[in-house]
Structure formats: C-alpha cells, structure tokens
Amino acid sequence: MLLLLCNRSVVPRGIRRILRTAATVTSLRWNHTGPSASETLLEKNIRNIGILAHIDGGKTTTTERMLFYAGKTNVLGEVHHGNTVTDFLVQERERGITICSAAVSFDWRDHRVNLLDTPGHIDFTMEVEQSLAAVDGTVVILDGSAGVEAQTVTVWSQADRHRLPRLVFVNKMDKESADFEGCLEELEKKLGVVAVPLQMPVIKEGKLTGVVDVLSGAQVVWDKQNHGRTYKAIPLVDQQLVEAQDKLYQIIDVLSGMDDGLAQVIIESDSMDNVKPELVASAIRACTMKQQIVPVFLGSAYKNIGVQLLMDAVLKYLPAPNERNEIYNCFGSDFVGKISKVTHDKQRGPLSLVRVFRGTLKKGAKIITAKGTSETIQRIYAPWADEYREISSISAGNVGLCAGPKSTVTGDLVVANASVLRNALKKLSPTNDGVEEDDINELLASKLSFHTVVPDAVYFCSIEPPSSSYQAALDAALREIQREDPSLRVSYDETTMQTVLGGMGKLHLEIIKSRILSEYKIDVDLGPLQIAYKETLEEPARGSWTAEKEIAGSKQLVRMEVTVHAKRKDERFLLDSSPEAQENLRMIRPRQMSYVRKGSLAALERGPKLGGQLMDVAVTLHQLTIGKGTADTFIMAATAQCVRHVLSSAKCRLMEPIMLLEMVMPAEHLNPILADLGKRRCEILDVTARGQQHKVLRANAPLAELEDYSSEVRCISSGTASVSMEPNGYALLSEMDEASAIRRAHGLE
C-alpha cells in the first residue's frame, strides 16, 4: 500500500502525522461482502438514512451508484434510461422524476445501510415527510451549479422538524458552471448552518478529475474504465498540499469552538500540531450528531466520482439507531415501532413500512396501534424498491414491510400489547395513572410526537368514473391511494353530488389520475382545477344553539353558547375563564368536553364562503348544557352545528395561497420577466447574481396567477430560464379579487 509522505518544509509536524496516518489508501477493489440478511446486526452497525434534494439534484443517480458499488446491482441504473431500481412506477420512468419514496438496503464495510430515496418535486413533499419518520440521518444533495434551491430549503426545514443530523453532497461538480465555494456560502446564508467542507475539487482543464480528501491529505481519483469501482489516493504536493493544510487548520479551528476535548488538547499543547487524527474525526461526528455542523462532500454521481467516500462518511458521521430516539427507552425491551408508509401490492395486499425502535417484530406477532386497534403480522419482507424478499423478523433499528395490518396509517405507533402502552405512558407521565382509553392516543402523541404533518391541499378538482358501474371500484381505489398518500384529500360535495380531490399541485393530481388508470384500470375524468382558498374572520361573532332530538327512545339534548374570533395563541378551542362560565363548565365531564372540542375543530374546517378551512380562527365556549343520556357523537355533531351557525352570520374573507418563486435566468432576460411578474400581483423579494452571466430572482406570487407559468417563462426566456415554486403561506384577497374568485369557483367566469 502507498503511504502518503508530506513535504516537511511546508507542513507542520502534527499535521504531517494526521495526513500520514490517514492517507494509506491506494488503488483497490472493495470487498462487497457484509452481514447476511439473516444475521442480527448490532444497532451500532446500522444506518437509516434518507436522500433529500431539489428536483433534478441527482438523488436517484446517487442512490443507484451506492447500490452498484455495494454490489447490490450489476448494471448502473440511469434515470434517462428508465432502468433505475428506486424509480419503479410507470409514471416515474416516463417522466424521469421520483414520485414515491423507495426503500432499499445494502451492506457497506460491515454495516447495513437502509436507504430511502425521496421525491424532489414540491407536489410530493408528503413522501419526504413520511420517509423522515423512519430515518436517523439524511444526505442532502445539491446541484453544484445551482446551489441551495427552493425545495432544498423545504426539505431542510422538514429535516429540522425531525431533528435529523445531515451531510451535504455537492453533486454535478463536473458541470462547467459548478461552484463549490458558492454552494458553501449559500448553505450558510440561506440555511443558517455551519458548513464544514471535508473535501476540495480537483479541476483540470475545466473538468472534475477527482477530489482532495482534506483529512487524509490525499487526492483521490477514480478509474473510468470500470465505472469508478476502483480508485486510488495520490500524495499531495506543492500548492495542493498547502491548501489542504489550510483547510485542515480551519476545520480544527471550527471544531475546537464546539468540542471541549479537542479544545483542551490545543490549549494544553498551545498548538494544533498535536491533534490526533482520531480526535478530529470524533469531533466531527460529535458536532454532526448535535447538529452544530454540516460536513460537506463533493463529486459527480453521474461521472462516478466521490460516491464511495460519501458512503464512508455515512458510516463515520451519521448516527446509529441506538444513538437516537432515547424517548422510546420507556418501552424497555418490548416491541415498539412506527408506521412510516403504507403501500398496496396486488398479490400481497396492503404493506406497512415499519421502523422498529425497540424490541423485535416477528412474523405471526399480534400487535396493537396506539388507537387500540389489534393487528396480526402475517408476513415480513425486506424492502427492495418494488421487490420483496420474505424474512422472519425485524430487529431494533431496522425497517421492514409487513403484510397483515388492515387499518394502520402513516404515523401510527405500534406496540406489543395494551399493557406495554400503559407502562410506557406511566414512565413518561407518572401523573396520568387515571387516563381514560379515549385520551391515551393524544397523550402518547404529545409525548412521542408520532402524528405526521400533512400539508394543506393547494388545488382541488372533481373526479368522475367513466360510468356509474365503476363508482364502487373508484371509491376503493381512492381509499387505497389516500392511505398511501395522506396529502391526497378525498371528499364528497353534496351540492354537486361529485367526489372531490384535493392535492398539492397540478402534477400531483395528474399522477393520481394516471395511477388510477394504470393500476386500477379505471379511465377517470378530472374536472377543472380550482384553487384551495382559505377563509378568516374580520371580526368576532357570538351566538347560541340548541339541538334536541329523540334517538331510539332516548332524548338527546345539547344547548351551548360560543364565540368565534381571531386566534390569539396556538389553541383553536378555548373555555371562557369568567367565574360565571367556569361554574357552568366545570360540571361537564372531561370526555364530553373532548367531543365538544372535536366538534368545534371539525366546524372550522369549512368556512361559509367557499367551504375553505378557517385560518387563525378559534372558538371560545361560554355555556354548555348536556342532557342526561346524550350520546358523545350527538354532542360532537351539535357543537359543529352551533359553530357553523355562528360562522354563517360572521363577516368572513377569503385568503389565497401564495407561492415562493425562485427563477434562474440569463441576465438579459431579467427585465422582461420582471415586467411579466408585475402583471401577476407579485412581490419581488430579491434579485442576486449567480456567476457572471445569470440572475436569481425570488418573488411571492398568488397561485391563481401562475397557471402554466413555467411555459410562459420558457417562452419569455427562449427556454433558458428555470422556475421552481413552493407554498409560502396565504394572503387576504381584495374585495374585487374575492368576488372574482367566488365567480370562478361557481363556474361563472
């Protein structure tokens, strides 16, 4: 093996030792053997990761290279050839984009890596949210020529919500316009992170030929003849060596401000020269785990450069399952897991992707959800995109697909039995010994945060089968697809007697239609797309309501008084705190009050103008009388009727969805695009330079003004500009625009 020797005249002794110790890699072919699928791996040897990026960032290509180098595939899958492992849907291969997240597993250096490849398009952001519930860390991929893009910010925020450590891989560094330093600046400015580059690009004659591994002080180059399977480390000399030394000093300087052990060594020796290489690596890992830094790597997955070093970094710097999720320790060695996704297979039926946090899930096991539903695990499969290999169990820290559960949905907590749930809850909240069954799910959700964040629909449209004989089959298909994709909203409009779909965008709904045809053989028609407006109150309104009815010989009575008003805090249901109100309300049982709350929140889902969800609106309950023997469901229905009655007399306004546009264009097309945006009620946020010839424009734009906007931009810029968009809140419509929106919704415009 080649031992890297350093130029003594330019490199201090301590740094020489770090470089000399680490850079002992030469040309070699990795042995792809690892733990067999039947072995029970130690949790410390497992990594559960998600691959995140803006659309066309190179997620799927990077994933395919990982599978190839790990020996799981014999041929390099290419998105443009439609032969990738993880893009298996017909629609994915036709369009060249990822629509559904796909799970694959491979072995690398005696570790098991469970990887989820996720979509990059904003319309399928729910797939990203589902995937993040099953992983312990992420790799965020940037296009080296585009930097931090709109959807990069979105997926980064999602990873922040899940408190996931992450690495960044700056991909497509083979492009002439790639700018590694620019990407580092954008990571820090747009995402507010401390980006620590552990590599530098090697550019010769304008082409990426390899990378400099700063920690080892080696230039690494890949063999083009065998698709980059083998690579070698070359000693650094002259200017490259000096630059690597400077970068290493910068890394140690950053880490010493965060890692006490590293800082102590430097203080005691009054120098960075005595820092041992293993201490540097340990500090990088510790700071990454605490999300204090983001290690940055580079390469070109398509050109087979840098991927193996990224795979090594996943093992070195991202956490093992037993280094996270400490809250699940309350379950001890009993089985507990989470459903992160549900899919449907024609032969196997519904399959639930389960992440096991503690214990072991075995074939034939009886489990329950936190909602109290009992399920049986009939079969267990190791995930491999759309192919499955049956296994006998899933150990702690791993993921697997389970056949058998009929009612599980994304976000469900699943455990061995009811007593396990009870014991865990007691450990988490010792004061909750007397909790009722109806409340256990909410208590566990508040402690374990297992509710999935489902984004609001942006568009909706009607859906019709080719004939009434297909209606039952269509309803069943929509139930299955909605179980897979919680961001798809399905409702029934009693006025038009039509089924209505709500989705994240035009593409989302087009894919739903295509899937119904290809998977269920139903050629449905979609109605015109409508904007999913929301509603809000201009001023509070107060009213009372009495609901009285006899059901099966039992008299049902609910009498209440409520106010609907602007939400002051996060809570959407409040109790009047006046002494008079409190004297009345404290007579109501907690279980009954929970149904009053549910009824109030249900009523806030449909406003009086266009049936849009009410934003920033709360309900305050003043007085409540419940007749003896009144059913809980009647209480909930009566409350919803009361709130709707009060809303009908309140002054409401429409709010329209706003999109954040990010456009990249040659500088000469900036003014025509600005002029066009001015006609669309847009708010220009900023215009920045990217390189010498391009501009990046960010603007807030009403969704109603953006129909086929991508096509318009291509026409204005002669096909040279790109545009991406993501939801960015809601804004109040003017009275004139509101009237126009109502006319359009009723088909009058």
Curated annotation (Swiss-Prot):
This is Ribosome-releasing factor 2, mitochondrial. Keywords: GTP-binding, Mitochondrion, Nucleotide-binding, Protein biosynthesis, Transit peptide. GO terms for cellular component: mitochondrion. Mitochondrial GTPase that mediates the disassembly of ribosomes from messenger RNA at the termination of mitochondrial protein biosynthesis. Not involved in the GTP-dependent ribosomal translocation step during translation elongation. It comes from the Eukaryota. GO terms for biological process: mitochondrial translation; ribosome disassembly. It comes from Culex quinquefasciatus. CDD domains: EFG_III (cd16262), EFG_mtEFG_C (cd03713). Its main location: mitochondrion. One of its GO terms (molecular function) is GTP binding.
